A protein has these predicted regions:
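N-terminal export signals
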Residues: 1-22
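Glycine-rich, acidic and aromatic/proline-enriched surface loops and short helix-turn segments
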Residues: 128, 159, 295-304, 491-492
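Solvent-exposed beta-strand/loop surfaces of large extracellular or lumenal domains
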Residues: 493-519, 536-541
Length: 672
């Protein structure tokens, strides 16, 4: 039987302060049962599989290993803020957000790779936090009592408990939340915590679904009450142009803080999920739908072709020479992952893949020993020259250890691991287990071990996606079991086909979850083919970008890497200067791009996002535009399209966005 799916409704399950004792936290554990939403929470459409259920394979495993061998695996050796003197390890050093940020990405990476060395690094942060709670219930270093860094640490502790079953976590969180509920009336949320309240509500809901303690819903309501009204702000969205430093400073007193924080890029990336998260407590359909309006407004006024919105440090318009902060990339991804689970909407997964396969790797070096603070879709130079940032400094698009500011140095590590842990989800319904099943929400080589209808299930996914459109899955239940398997059909994938054991199913509709319900037996094979057709999208001044599947394509400008300084180990800071012209306009029919573009594919290697061997290349006709030049290390605003040029026609080679570090992604279009 084959049909298109609908959303499911979940059921809470009991929670107790039980789990593995301290010291039983290493080695593989059988996947825990899926935890659904407990009444009276409004159910999510899908549920996250317990951490440890998904394992990377193929190129994704290699990418995570590159990360582990890069800065993530050695950060404490080269950066004192998360080194042995960190306040979150009992030292006298940095005691605010950086230790929790680092742990939030290090933990899932360590366990995805089953890497004993990385686990040991993470365990030190966890143990210190669990063993040094304050007598009143507060956690963390005594240097400050700011709510915000605790919000981040709670996210890390929930992951750790799922991965290890450590019996210390739930009582510590319970004591902390009871303390906070009593304290918030005297010491309300402020600054970052006020604007990022939804991240704590996630942890509150996580604990409620395991314990059923009613006070937790009172705490969630208080956090919402004291937090910034993001939904209301977007209902009357005022920030429709590039924010200037002068504009932010126009406000006095408290207005200054709120205006600056409401236009702050990372805050907006985290806020994307506030409607769906709060809808679980409020039960409001309108709250749940708010995510779509927020994304629409950000894309309309600040959208960029790599899937991001501009923010350098604040919202900065649609010019592709504006930047997007790396913290915003990974927080936007996390918001999409959470919003996708709650809403079950395919479009959120489409955008998630666009960020994961373009913006995330596009701002990291191939070996992941260096990153940028800001990346640009039209990035013609990475240097100390003045850039068109709103408030960020001149090092913001350099590649290095701590360009501009250290928040991204601590925070970017969560991007790949959390994406890997979101590839597969679980469906379920409150009334019975008829809808219990597995959901493929994003695609990458992976395998999943879980239980469906009390039957152990192993699914293997083999693919070179996003560089190819074919995906092969092998379903291996321990015994035959009937359940629905949902497969996401991206919105761009018209003409997709699905075969089960060689038999072609009814053609699925793009932008839906295809639902296959059958009795699955060991060795059942699924073949999915997504046509990877070329398509175009329109951006600033009617410029044009080219996409294929989830990948965005760019012209890779010649690069001259000049070392600015050496740090420790393999860490260095780099400027990158152009060695080839970049001011091209494309000559193609935007309505039928395949008629004017030649596509070639090569083998997907161990570094698929590396510059040396892009797995896909496009060849397209172009001409230089003499008046379009650069100034102070940035491309001037794109000329209005269509445009004419008398210069000689050339053939440009375009490659996946992430394989370039100097690039043009939004092109003027030549007049036909």
């Amino acid at each position: 039987m084959y049909a298109i799916s609908s959303l499911g409704v979940g059921l809470g399950c009991p929670g107790l302060f039980t789990g593995a004792a301290h010291g039983e936290t290493t080695g593989a554990r059988p996947p825990s049962p899926v935890v659904k939403d407990r009444q009276p929470l409004a159910s999510s459409a899908f549920f996250f599989l317990p951490l440890g259920s998904i394992r990377p394979r193929g190129w994704l495993s290699e990418q995570l290993r590159i990360q582990a061998n890069g800065l993530t695996g050695h950060l404490g050796e080269v950066w004192n803020d998360v080194g042995p003197n960190s306040g979150w390890l009992g030292g006298s050093g940095e005691s605010w957000e950086r230790g929790p940020y680092y742990l939030d990405g290090l933990l899932p990476l360590a366990y995805l790779l089953d890497d004993a060395r990385l686990k040991a690094i993470a365990q030190k942060f966890v143990d210190w936090t669990l063993e040094h709670g304050w007598s009143n219930g507060m956690i963390g270093p005594a240097k400050n009592d700011d709510w915000w860094p605790r919000i981040v640490m709670l996210k890390a502790l929930t992951q750790y408990q799922e991965l290890t079953g450590d019996s210390r976590v739930l009582p510590l969180m319970d004591k902390y939340f009871r303390y906070q509920l009593a304290e918030l009336s005297k010491r309300p949320l402020r600054d970052w915590g006020k604007f990022r309240w939804q991240d704590e509500v996630l942890s509150v809901i996580w604990l409620y679904n395991r314990t059923g303690s009613a006070y937790l819903l009172d705490l969630a309501r208080m956090l919402h009450q004291q937090g910034f009204d993001w939904t209301g702000s977007f209902d009357d969205f005022r920030f429709k142009e590039k924010i200037t430093a002068e504009y932010i400073k126009l406000e006095k007193g408290e207005g200054l803080a709120d205006l600056a924080l409401a236009t702050h890029g990372v805050n907006n990336g985290q806020a994307i999920k506030c409607g769906p998260v709060w809808s679980q407590v409020s039960g409001s359909v309108e709250d749940r739908k708010a995510v779509f309006h927020m994304i629409e407004e950000l894309n309309r006024y600040h959208g960029l072709p790599n899937g991001m919105f501009s923010c350098d440090e604040h919202l900065s318009g649609r010019d592709p020479s504006q930047g997007s902060e790396l913290c915003t990339v990974v927080e936007y991804m996390f918001s999409l992952e959470r919003s996708l689970a709650i809403t079950g909407d395919v479009s959120l997964a489409d955008r998630l893949e666009k960020l994961a396969y373009n913006a995330l790797p596009g701002t990291l070096t191939d070996d992941m020993w260096a990153h940028q603070y800001n990346q640009e879709p039209n990035q013609v130079e990475c240097s100390l020259h003045h850039k068109p940032w709103v408030t960020d400094g001149p090092e913001s698009n350099l590649f290095g250890l701590e360009p501009n500011f250290g928040c991204c140095t601590a925070n970017y590590h969560q991007g790949w691991p959390k994406f890997a842990n979101s590839l597969w989800m679980f469906s379920g319904a409150q009334e019975n287990d008829h809808e219990d099943g597995l959901v493929a929400v994003a695609y990458a080589p992976s395998e999943v071990h879980t239980r469906v209808r009390d039957t152990p299930l192993h699914v293997i996914e083999e693919t070179d996606y996003p560089f190819r459109g074919s995906i092969r899955m092998t379903v291996v239940p321990e015994t035959p079991v009937a359940f629905p398997l949902r497969l996401r059909i991206p919105g761009w994938a018209s003409g997709a086909t699905i075969r089960v054991n060689g038999e072609k199913l009814q053609d699925p509709e793009a932008g839906t979850f295809a639902r296959i319900e059958r009795t699955w037996r060991a060795g059942d094979r699924i073949e999915i083919v997504f046509p990877m057709r070329l398509r175009t999208s329109r951006w600033f001044n009617d410029s044009i970008s080219i996409e294929r599947g989830p990948l965005v394509f760019s012209y890779g400008i010649g690069e001259d890497w000049v070392k600015l300084r050496d740090n420790r180990l393999k860490s260095s800071d780099w400027q990158v200067f152009p060695t080839t012209p970049w001011n091209y306009a494309l000559n193609l029919n935007a309505e039928s791009p395949e008629a004017g573009i030649m596509v070639s594919e090569t083998e997907v290697g161990p570094r698929p996002f590396g510059r040396e061997h892009p797995p896909v290349r496009l060849r397209v006709k172009a001409r230089q535009i003499a008046p379009w030049r650069g100034d102070d290390g940035a491309a001037n605003p794109l000329p209005q399209s269509p445009i004419t040029s008398e210069l000689q026609e050339e053939i440009l080679t375009l490659v996946p966005y992430a394989t370039t570090k100097l690039r043009i992604t939004a092109f003027p279009q030549l007049k036909s």
